[in-house]
Amino acid sequence: MAESERRFIVHRNEWIWGRTWVIVAEVGTGLIKISQDEDDGVVLSGLSVLPEFRHKGIGTSLVREAERIVREEIGAGEDITLSVESKNKELIGWYSWLGYSVYDYDRNYTEMIIVNY
């Protein structure tokens, strides 16, 4: 299924401390969370794709859908950050391929950011 044909369920919440969106990919094959608050800005977290559905473009579709929501509902130009375990070189490389850059690193976590997406 082409990325443009994917379907998502988006659940939005407003909290005292900010807003969250949870995006679920077609038939529950994967999900990602967007959080926005005054302290941390916009953060992607919890990207998860069921093992049998990996390497089929679902993770990429979820990240791109999250970026679309940030552009349209939060505002274009808002930086998006995320954290990856520093030992997970494959995932760091994948996020780099998607356009994210490392902006902070320690032995436990690598912080990545995308701007002008």
Please tell me what each predicted stretch does.
Residues V10-H11, W15-G30:
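Conserved beta-hairpin
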Residues I80-I92, N108-Y117:
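Conserved beta-strand-loop-alpha-helix junction that forms the acyl-donor binding cleft
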Residues T60, S86-Y105:
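Conserved active-site alpha-helix within GNAT-family acetyltransferase domains
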Residues D40-P51, T110:
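Conserved acetyl-CoA binding element of GNAT-fold acetyltransferases
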Residues V49, H55-I69, G93, W97:
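Conserved acetyl-CoA-binding loop-helix of GNAT-fold acetyltransferases
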Residues G41, V70-E85:
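Conserved GNAT acetyl-CoA-binding A-motif
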Residues I32-D39:
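A conserved beta-strand-loop-helix scaffold within acyl/acetyltransferase catalytic domains
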